Design a protein with these regions (language model features):
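Glycine/proline-enriched, intrinsically flexible loops and inter-domain linkers
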Residues: 1-288
Length: 288
């Protein structure tokens, strides 16, 4: 059955859209900002957690000594491999559920593609507050619309998933719902293991290319929220058609052996992306 419940747009939605980057002062000490972001708990390595268990999955994990945006699982006696990733930024979904969830699917696809694979299908874990709260149900409806939009674009059917409602806390007798968190798990296929692509810079004399248009956009960023303590902004610029075309181009570059590594820009922005790519082989970077 299809539920037809009441839903309404929260008051904050239009308020968040009024954010202006010019209202944020640019810090004088950018080195201090870089150190702050690098140590941020949402950005820093989670190795201390996942190394507590069998993170190598026996001998099947091909990402152990070859870091990739998506986890690569070896298919023995085959030239193919599986690429897997889990993605969601609840802050962006809260700011704009439809765009935020569409972006979560797109980021999952981006991780698969940057690793040398092709997106195949998704599952999900949808975490929301009380569905009888019209504003919470509005978040849920928007998230489903965004997920559907991206899945159609990337041709990734939803093979399964679950919905968890009533995730909330009671503060002074008031129900506070969690941020809407439609977590996306995506499976991809690497048709040829030779196409597996690391996120790490490989050679000190390599050139670094930024693909896609770079915009002066800090909306919903970890930098804006954690460093400036500013929590009211909408989602950053996102165009699903441009995203799809860009991922198609990256896939072509990988298959034609035109690039040595690929890494998507995510939490922490361009600086963190460059830092993550440079650390594994102890290589620095110089950019203009």
């Amino acid at each position: 059955p299809v539920y037809e419940r009441e839903y309404s747009e929260p008051e904050y939605f239009k308020r968040f859209q009024k954010f202006n980057i010019n209202d944020i002062n640019e810090p004088e000490d950018l080195v201090e900002v870089a150190k702050f972001l690098t140590a941020n708990h949402n950005i820093a390595s989670k190795r201390f957690v996942y190394e507590q268990y069998d993170s190598m999955v026996g001998t099947a994990n091909m990402s152990t000594n070859f870091p990739t945006d998506a986890g690569i699982v070896n298919l023995k006696d085959s030239n193919k491999a599986l690429a897997m990733t889990v993605d969601c930024n609840a802050r962006m979904v809260n700011a704009n559920p439809e765009e935020g969830c569409a972006m979560a699917v797109a980021e999952a696809a981006r991780n698969i593609v940057c690793s040398g694979g092709s997106p195949s299908a998704i599952t999900n874990c949808l975490n929301f507050g009380n569905p009888y709260n019209p504003e919470v149900y509005w978040q849920f409806v928007g998230s489903i619309k965004g997920m559907a939009k991206s899945c159609r674009k990337f041709n990734t059917p939803v093979t399964g998933g679950n919905v968890s409602f009533y995730n909330q806390s009671s503060v002074d007798g008031v129900e506070i719902p969690v941020f809407p968190t439609p977590t996306i798990g995506m499976l991809g296929i690497v048709e040829n293991k030779d196409d597996i692509t690391t996120l790490a810079f490989e050679h000190p004399d390599s050139s670094i290319y930024l693909l896609g248009e770079s915009l002066n956009d800090i909306n919903c960023s970890e930098y804006l929220v954690s460093y400036h303590k500013f929590n009211e902004s909408t989602t950053p610029f996102f165009d699903l058609d441009i995203e799809f075309d860009l991922q198609t181009s990256v896939s072509s570059l990988i298959k034609n052996k035109l690039i040595l590594s690929a890494h998507d820009i995510s939490d922490g922005g361009l600086f963190i992306t460059l830092l993550e790519s440079s650390m594994y082989n102890n290589l620095g970077f110089s950019i203009k």
